[in-house]
C-alpha cells in the first residue's frame, strides 16, 4: 500500500500495527533512493558507520544526492554530497571536508574552510561525477567549544598549531577511518582527492583507499586568514 493510501483516522490512530506498517513503508521509500543510486545499504562487519538515508539536494552549484551516515558508537551523523553516478568509478573527484561550524555556517573569515567547501562543490558539479564527504570533525577533531577556546588563544597571539597544543590536543586530531568506510559504502574504486593537505592522502591510504592523484583546492586569502593559511603551510605541510 502506498503512503497516500495509508490515511490516519480515528480507527488507526495509536494502532501499533498501523504505526509499524507506516514506518516500514516510509523506510521502503527512503531506501529505494539509496538502492537506485547503487549504494551499499547493508550492515558491513567491522564498519562503524552505515547508510541511513538518501534524498535529492538542489543547490546553487547543481542538484546532488545527499547521503546520510550514522556512526553507532557516538551517534555522530556524517554526510556525502554526491554528483552523478559514482558506483564503480575510478579516479573519482572527492573531497573529505571536516565540519567547520564557524566558517561553513557563519561565513567566518578566520579560516578558508567555507571557500574550500564551495570550490569543491563547484568543481564536482562541473564534472561527470564526484563527492564531498562532510565529517563531524569540528576544529580538526577537538570539537566546537575547544575550537572557540583556541580562537581566544589565537586572539592573544598564538598560531593555530600552538593554540591546539596549549589546550592539550595534537595539532590535528582527525582520522579518516569513517571517510574510508563511506567511500567503500558508495562503492567507489579509487579517488582523485581535492585537498591541499598531504596528511589526508596519507590517512586515506592508510585505511586502504586508493588515491590516484591530488587536485589542489585554490582559494583566495584575506587579511583575516592569511596567518592561518601560512601556518598550515609552514608547520603542517600544506601544499598550494
Predicted features, each with a name:
Residues 2-240:
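Catalytic domains of riboflavin
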Amino acid at each position: 500500500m502506498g503512503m497516500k493510501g495509508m490515511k490516519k483516522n480515528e480507527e488507526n490512530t495509536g494502532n501499533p500495527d498501523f504505526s509499524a506498517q507506516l514506518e516500514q513503508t516510509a523506510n521502503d521509500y527512503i531506501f529505494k533512493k539509496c538502492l537506485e543510486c547503487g549504494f551499499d545499504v547493508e550492515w558491513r562487519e567491522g564498519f562503524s558507520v552505515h547508510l541511513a538515508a538518501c534524498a535529492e539536494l538542489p543547490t546553487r552549484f547543481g542538484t546532488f544526492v545527499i547521503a546520510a551516515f550514522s556512526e553507532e558508537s557516538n551517534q555522530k551523523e556524517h554526510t556525502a554530497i554526491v554528483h552523478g553516478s559514482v558506483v564503480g568509478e575510478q579516479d573519482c573527484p572527492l573531497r573529505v571536508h571536516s565540519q567547520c561550524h564557524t566558517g561553513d555556517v557563519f561565513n567566518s573569515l578566520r579560516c578558508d574552510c567555507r571557500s574550500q567547501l564551495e570550490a569543491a562543490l563547484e568543481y564536482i558539479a562541473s564534472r561527470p561525477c564526484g563527492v564531498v564527504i562532510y565529517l563531524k570533525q569540528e576544529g580538526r577533531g577537538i570539537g566546537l567549544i575547544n575550537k572557540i577556546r583556541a580562537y581566544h588563544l589565537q586572539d592573544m597571539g598564538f598560531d593555530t598549531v600552538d593554540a591546539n597544543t596549549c589546550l592539550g590536543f595534537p595539532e590535528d586530531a582527525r582520522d579518516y577511518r569513517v571517510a574510508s568506510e563511506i567511500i567503500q559504502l558508495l562503492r567507489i574504486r579509487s579517488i582523485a582527492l581535492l585537498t591541499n593537505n598531504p596528511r589526508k592522502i596519507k590517512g586515506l591510504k592508510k585505511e586502504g583507499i586508493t588515491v590516484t592523484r591530488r587536485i589542489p583546492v585554490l582559494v583566495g586569502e584575506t587579511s583575516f586568514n592569511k596567518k592561518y593559511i601560512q601556518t598550515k603551510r609552514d608547520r603542517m605541510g600544506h601544499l598550494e
